[in-house]
Swiss-Prot record:
This is Enolase. The keyword Cytoplasm applies. Binds a second Mg(2+) ion via substrate during catalysis. It is found in: Cytoplasm; Secreted; Cell surface. It comes from Bifidobacterium longum subsp. infantis (strain ATCC 15697 / DSM 20088 / JCM 1222 / NCTC 11817 / S12). Pfam families: Enolase_C, Enolase_N. One of its GO terms (cellular component) is peptidoglycan-based cell wall. Pathway: Carbohydrate degradation; glycolysis; pyruvate from D-glyceraldehyde 3-phosphate: step 4/5.
């Protein structure tokens, strides 16, 4: 047993300079674990509650000292003496201590910090790297890195309506080759934008964030960059979008403010279909608002046999919402964010439910990140075959990509790159 001996939380800063929670946990056998909690900019309304202090005179109200206090004074006394390796029992206890449906008492940032710290301590106690501890010998497939090279939406002061334009280098034999291709396209894109006289400042996730005349202009520049870097769009590198449509959806009118006009759901569906006919798009995240279940079901029925539709705000890594989507035929892919649901156990449950029902899973960072690399290990451990963690720039993003390089090296000849197999719905563009 990895008996928990001590738990301690502190307030630290994330990649946007906002406070977040760090939890340090030690077991009686000397194993140590640290849990660093990320934070999102565009968040789903159904996400687990992130506890903030609300004192506008300190960090603009974004302090997390109350979440830290919840760990040190409420959670720690209850979990000391428990087996850190019994992840479900530990997480269930914290959820019970909270006693609300959305972790609205203690805060998901408090609970997740302890959950992650226990996970790391247990892996160290077992003498295993995290991906091996979680996934056993089955964890050997390196994910396709969906790299956010142009930022918009809430990540870049709405330079474009669409929040993320990602490249997906799936047409390569190894992860390291794919990463290299993505990096080369990223740097080439900077030159393409400069030649057009466009700003090359960066958004929250390291992608370029120039103000565009239309959402489609970004796609054209990315296509130019892929070709200029010496790669073939569609065959080697595809495009993924995170529309984050809830951010520009008007609940009162039921319409989307898109490209400067009010658009209804029928228009948006046709727009997406036209886009995928024109560009090698393999994945669209949050094409409709987070409660637009009928629209989600409609687009999945119409285009789901040729495209991946990823539920982020729709599903919030919540097994209950995922089950509703399965029942309705809404979406065909789950975005996985640990802090959306607030515990390791519930995150693993969501991935397993998705897999059992034919949904793909894409493990994801948040816009407010830390140097933590849990999501890299998680993607390999659960064979999700996809990860998104920003542009190949900014240390908190690159740390995740570098961790995958380490894992690839550790796995040696047993390492496999997911490549085309990551996007099983996208038969139009991808090799058989």
């Amino acid at each position: 047993m990895a008996v928990i001996e001590s738990v301690y939380a502190r307030q630290i800063l994330d990649s946007r300079g906002n406070p977040t929670v760090e939890v340090y946990l030690e077991t009686e056998d000397g194993a140590q674990g640290k849990g660093l909690v990320p934070s999102g900019a565009s968040t789903g309304e159904a996400e687990a509650w992130e506890r903030r202090d609300g004192d506008k005179s300190v960090y603009g109200g974004k302090g997390v000292l109350n979440a830290v206090k919840a760990v040190n004074e409420v959670i720690a006394p209850k979990v000391i003496g428990m087996d850190a390796a019994d992840q479900r029992a530990l997480d269930d206890l914290m959820i019970e201590l909270d006693g609300t449906p959305n972790k609205g008492k203690l805060g998901a940032n408090a609970i997740l910090g302890v959950s992650l710290a226990a996970l790391y301590a247990s892996a160290e106690s077992a003498g295993l790297p995290l991906y091996r501890y979680i996934g056993g010998t089955n964890g050997h497939i390196l994910p396709v890195p969906n790299m956010n090279i142009m930022n918009g939406g809430a990540h870049a002061d709405f330079a474009t309506d669409i929040q993320e334009y990602m490249i997906s280098p799936y047409g390569f034999d190894t992860y390291s080759e794919a990463l290299r291709a993505g990096v080369e396209v990223y740097h080439t894109l900077k030159n393409v934008l400069k030649k057009e006289g466009l700003n090359t400042g960066l958004g929250d996730e390291g992608g370029f964030a120039p103000k565009m005349k239309s959402n489609e202009d970004s796609l054209k520049y990315i296509m130019d960059a892929i070709s200029a870097a010496g790669y073939e769009p569609g065959k080697q590198i595809g495009i993924c979008l995170d529309v984050a449509s809830s951010e520009f959806y008007n609940k009162e009118t039921g319409k989307y403010r898109f490209d400067g006009e009010e658009r209804d759901s029928a228009y948006m569906l046709d727009y997406y279909e036209n886009l995928i006919n024109e560009y090698p798009i393999v994945s669209i995240e949050d094409p409709f608002n987070e409660e637009g279940w009928e629209d989600w079901a409609a687009i999945t029925a119409r285009l789901g046999d040729r495209l991946q539709f990823v539920g982020d705000d729709l599903l919030v890594t919540n097994p209950a919402r995922l089950q509703k989507a399965i029942d309705l035929g809404a979406a065909n892919s789950l975005l996985v964010k640990l802090n959306q649901i607030g515990s390791v156990t519930e995150t693993l449950d969501a991935i397993e439910l998705a897999t059992a029902n034919g949904y793909t899973s894409m493990v994801s960072h948040r816009s407010g990140e830390t140097p933590d690399t849990t999501i890299s290990d998680l993607a390999v451990a659960k064979n999700t075959r996809q990860i998104k963690t920003g542009a190949p720039a900014r240390g908190e993003r690159v740390a995740k990509y570098n961790r995958l390089l380490e894992i690839e090296e550790e796995l040696g000849s047993t390492a496999q790159y997911a490549g085309y197999t990551a996007f099983k719905a996208c038969k139009k563009y991808l090799a058989k």
